[in-house]
Amino acid sequence: RQRLDSSHVIGLVSHMSRLECVQETLRLALEALEPIEALARPVAWSVWWERYVASKLDYRTEAEPLRAKMAQAGQDAHDLLRWAKGQEGARAARKAVELLERVYAENFEEASGEAVDQRRAQPPGAVHNPHDPEAQWSTKKTTAQKEWVGYKVQVAETVEAQPRAAKEPTR
């Protein structure tokens, strides 16, 4: 006999907004690319560094400036990815660049090669925290709705059937 059970495992990551996720992924990519010598870096490097590594997002900002920051982050990610593809030194930071490429593709659409538009909805399996990109956002609709970022786990138990006497309770 086989018994199946499922549960959820909460990831050890904070819940991030889409803007936070994009900005944090940009920060991780910039830090991974930092060992590249200064002369090989793009002109906008110091601006990106100030924008994503040296400063933090103010959550009390109104919606319109947050939309502008998301558009700016999308353009910066686009420019950084385009620059990183042509760099020999960027190979050492391959994982961070690939993660940035994934987050960029999940959050933005290219309109005319340069301009980027924010996607209305993220695809299933989208990155919700760059520190654990495999952790997924999930919800369970019960009497009290549960939401979490983490993993779903299914466990299968196999039990050999035990011979029992008639009218004996099952175990």
Model regions: which residues?
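Polybasic low-complexity intrinsically disordered regions
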Residues: 1-171
